[in-house]
Regions:
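Terminal leader/tail segments of proteins
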Residues: 1-96, 100-173
């Protein structure tokens, strides 16, 4: 995937990034032709665990982390976009192609997620340095991140609608 971290000002200090007063956004653009729900879950569960020393004692954050790792109902496709954002003293949110997947109070969830990129075991050393602005980012990648157009809007809400229809049909039997 292609990833971007957006902050109000360029800053590579984790304390600044983790601060509840800092607005922040992670952008993930799927680059592989197909990313299975199973593989998505494996990668994110692993990255969350190895980059966060303690698992949150907040049950809402635990539930949000689990929801994040399990939300794809079908394969993600090249061009799908996942946004994880946080507004100061507000909520952390995850969106898939513009659809709200989850929302949880505070910055703890966002910080667990961003730590998968800037923590002790990021995807690669170069990835971490690029995310933190410590190395020049490939201009084509930067352009792709900044000009990305959502291609499969309504994907998540479609999955949920199908699940609800199936549940309703089962209840009516």
């Amino acid at each position: 995937y292609l990833g971007g971290l957006y902050l109000p000002t360029l800053n590579d200090d984790p304390d600044y990034i983790f601060a509840a007063t800092t607005a922040k956004r992670m952008q993930i653009i799927v680059k592989v032709p197909s990313w299975s729900p199973r593989r998505w879950s494996q990668i994110w569960q692993n990255n969350i665990v190895i980059n966060n020393d303690d698992y949150s004692s907040d049950p809402l954050v635990q539930e949000a982390l689990t929801t994040f790792t399990l939300f794809p109902r079908q394969d993600l496709k090249a061009g799908d976009e996942i946004i994880i954002d946080y507004q100061p003293n507000g909520n952390s949110r995850v969106l898939l192609n513009g659809d709200l997947v989850l929302e949880v109070a505070g910055s703890t969830f966002f910080n667990y997620m961003v730590n998968t990129w800037i923590g002790k075991l990021p995807p690669t050393r170069e990835f971490r340095q690029n995310i933190l602005g410590q190395e020049a980012v490939d201009q084509d990648q930067k352009t792709e991140l900044l000009s990305h157009q959502v291609q499969r809007a309504g994907l998540f809400s479609g999955w949920i609608a199908v699940e609800q229809a199936v549940l309703k049909a089962e209840q009516e039997r």
